[in-house]
């Protein structure tokens, strides 16, 4: 199994690559509001991912010391998502609402696809 820091670093790199593609889409196409919504949602998704990584590291340290931790910070991530949707709702001339929500969910397919790829790699190495 991979080191969690390597996994998080790889997933962060994938998310930044997707964000760069969205920025190119904003600059090169006529769908400005759609790509701006994707960018907004993905930036908040990246921030939520970084919050999750930070909380998971704190959780690991607490487990090593035999202490308990209250939560993994779901409330903070929900508040960030609500903030992103509120920004898109207040500024529909700049941000497409549906693409903002899609951008917020960008990290989840990245995590799943990365996990699937790593599972395939590890099964290929065992053969």
From Swiss-Prot:
A single GO cellular-component term on record: proton-transporting ATP synthase complex
Protein location: Cell membrane
Domain of life: Bacteria
Segments crossing the lipid bilayer: 13-30, 33-53, 97-117
Keywords: Cell membrane, CF(0), Hydrogen ion transport, Ion transport, Membrane, Transmembrane, Transmembrane helix, Transport
Membrane topology: Multi-pass membrane protein
Record-level GO BP terms: proton transmembrane transport
Main localization (coarse): membrane
Family: Belongs to the bacterial AtpI family.
Function: A possible function for this protein is to guide the assembly of the membrane sector of the ATPase enzyme complex.
Protein name: ATP synthase protein I
Organism of origin: Bacillus subtilis (strain 168)
């Amino acid at each position: 199994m991979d080191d969690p820091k390597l996994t998080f670093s790889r997933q962060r790199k994938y998310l930044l690559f997707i964000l760069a593609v969205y920025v190119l889409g904003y600059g090169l196409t006529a769908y400005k509001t759609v790509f701006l919504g994707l960018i907004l949602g993905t930036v908040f998704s990246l921030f939520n991912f970084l919050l999750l990584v930070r909380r998971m590291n704190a959780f690991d340290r607490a487990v090593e010391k035999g202490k308990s931790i209250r939560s993994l910070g779901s409330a903070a991530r929900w508040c960030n998502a609500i903030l992103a949707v509120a920004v898109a709702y207040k500024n529909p001339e700049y941000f497409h609402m549906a693409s903002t929500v899609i951008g917020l969910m960008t990290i989840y397919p990245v995590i799943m696809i990365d996990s699937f790829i790593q599972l395939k790699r590890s099964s290929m190495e065992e053969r």
